[in-house]
Regions:
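Peripheral, non-AAA+ core regions of ATP-driven protein-machinery
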Residues: 1-227, 231, 237, 340, ...
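Basic, amphipathic alpha-helical bundle interface domains used for macromolecular binding and assembly
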Residues: 40-51, 66-67, 74-84, 298-299, ...
């Protein structure tokens, strides 16, 4: 008897349909000595091992299969490698239906995904949101998943999602006991709006550092990458962690995409649904290239994709592998990463704000107001050369951070709240959304192309003259020219100004500390 069950496989962020075909045959005579279980269709080790899990789960759930049966299982399409443990549930149901222990027609319009424990319990699998989206797009009526995945899958509207704790519950439901499983209710928009109000960090907690906080406001308003240079303990990490709190709130579409990435990576918490806060990722500097960019034997999103729609913070930037840092250059421009391996070729999104932090020299105290630096100009220059020019070029805002005096820490009042700063940032982003509405793929000032600078930046004659003067007097490099205009345009947007003035240019020039040719030579 041949039974067909619908399930799905992951390919990058997307899910693709997989048909599990289970052919059951009674063995007689000498055939009884033959191997009784065959799997075809490019299953990996985890899928091959499912045979033992499924047989034990069936036995411990009270289902007794007849002896001397041969099972041939095909995972179609057969030319795509099948990975993971999510095929356990459809395989078990196929074996039961092949032995007339449940009606095969009851499974025709349902997608089944889930890992089985030896006791028949259902365990969560990764990528459930992508699978639910695919199931709805293909017109299936329902999706049966482990209970721990039900909230995640129920985010997708117009699809019935049933969460099951055990295999026995699923079998009872398919045998007509409709009260064995209940559909999971989830009001996506209401839950999303409620969860967005939680902000874990606030700029009001930061004492002093008025200039640095202003730089972060400009960065958030224009989507600019930021590089902080300062001695140890001056608050670089503290401020970087608070950057997501002033970024515009995630839209529902951004939230769905961000949740998909975390789900595929297996990092979405059990019984959770949507990620409603912008991600903040801060990997250690000994991270491998594959962990940062993505890849591996089985494709996994890297840190740059995990930070999609959020912030990637690289502390101690010069300590990161040179190859890992250089590998980020193209994804920073394209806002996506294509990973090609022998077994797969996938493209993952990675549109994020990059925030880097580093010491100004090997000893760390070159810019410290009281502690003397013990490094020579040559040592400082050599230290800075660990960051290549093309990567340094990706940082629109480069600022020096100095320690806050002790008396200011104890007496200074609370700073401006993140909520107040965010209001100005959102207003500036709205102006940019309107400005770039006719330019596909451009959403903020940091993404402007070179030819758009002349067309859309709108510099006043005084601003143009101030920029020329700054380039000459400060001996700024050529790559700083376009970056200054982009940042100045953002400063103008924060002030709701249509044109970029000379004052806007002056502030933008102040954010190019490391671009001076004489930096670190003193």
């Amino acid at each position: 008897m041949l039974v067909k069950i619908h399930t799905a496989a992951l390919n990058g962020l997307e899910a693709m349909p997989v048909l599990v075909e289970v052919n059951t045959q009674l063995l007689q005579g000498q055939q009884a000595e033959e191997q009784r279980f065959h799997m075809v269709g490019l299953p990996d080790n985890a899928v091959r091992e499912s045979r033992l899990r499924v047989l034990s789960a069936l036995q411990n759930s009270g289902f007794k299969l007849p002896g001397f049966m041969r099972y041939v299982v095909n995972f179609a399409p057969a030319d795509i490698r099948k990975e993971g443990s999510g095929y356990d549930l459809p395989l078990a149901l196929g074996m039961l239906a092949g032995n007339n222990m449940l009606p095969a027609e009851s499974m025709q319009h349902i997608v089944f995904v889930g890992e089985l424990g030896l006791d028949g319990s259902l365990r969560s699998v990764r990528g459930m949101l992508s699978i639910a989206i695919k199931a709805r797009s293909m017109g299936f009526d329902a999706l049966i998943v482990p209970q721990a995945n039900a909230q995640e899958a129920a985010v997708v509207n117009r699809l019935k999602v049933y969460g099951a704790a055990t295999l026995a519950q699923v079998v009872a439901f398919l045998n007509g006991h409709t009260d064995a499983l209940q559909p999971t209710d989830y009001d996506t928009r209401a839950e999303f709006a409620a969860a967005q109000r939680i902000v874990p960090y606030d700029f009001a907690e930061v004492k002093g550092q008025i200039g640095v906080k202003r730089a972060f406001e400009v960065a958030a308003a224009g989507g600019h990458n930021v590089l902080m240079v300062g001695s140890p303990g001056c608050g670089k990490s503290m401020m970087a962690k608070r950057l997501p709190s002033i970024l515009p709130p995630l839209s529902l579409a951004e939230s769905l995409e961000t949740t998909q990435i975390h789900s595929v990576a297996g990092l979405l918490a059990a019984d959770s649904s949507l990620i409603t806060q912008r991600p903040f990722r801060s990997p250690h500097h000994n991270i491998s290239d594959a962990a940062l960019i993505g890849g591996g034997t089985y494709c996994r999103p890297g840190e740059i994709s995990m930070a999609h729609n959020g912030v990637l913070f690289l502390d101690e930037l010069p300590e990161f592998s040179r190859t890992a840092l250089e590998a980020m250059r193209q994804p920073l421009e394209d806002r996506c990463i294509t990973i090609s391996r022998a077994k797969y070729n996938v493209t993952l999104p990675c549109s994020f704000m990059l925030v880097g932090a580093m010491n100004p020299c090997p000893c760390g105290y070159y810019t410290h107001p009281t502690r003397p630096c013990t490094c020579t100009p040559g040592q400082r220059q050599q230290y800075m050369k660990k960051i290549s020019g093309p990567l340094l070029d990706r940082f629109d805002i480069q600022i020096e951070v100095t320690p806050v005096p002790v008396d200011e820490l104890s007496t200074a009042p609370a700073g401006e709240s993140s909520a107040a700063i965010r209001q100005r940032v959102v207003a500036a982003r709205e102006r940019q959304t309107e400005r770039y509405s006719q330019h596909r793929g451009i959403h903020c000032n940091a993404q402007m192309t070179d030819h758009m600078l002349t067309e859309l930046a709108n510099l006043t004659p005084a601003a143009t003259e101030r920029l020329k003067m700054a380039m000459q007097m400060l001996d700024l490099s050529a790559r700083a020219y376009g970056r200054i205009i982009k940042v100045a345009r953002t400063i103008a947007d924060l002030e709701q100004a249509d044109a970029v003035s000379a004052d806007h240019i002056a502030e933008a020039v102040a954010y190019r500390s490391l671009d001076r040719r004489d930096w670190a030579e003193a």
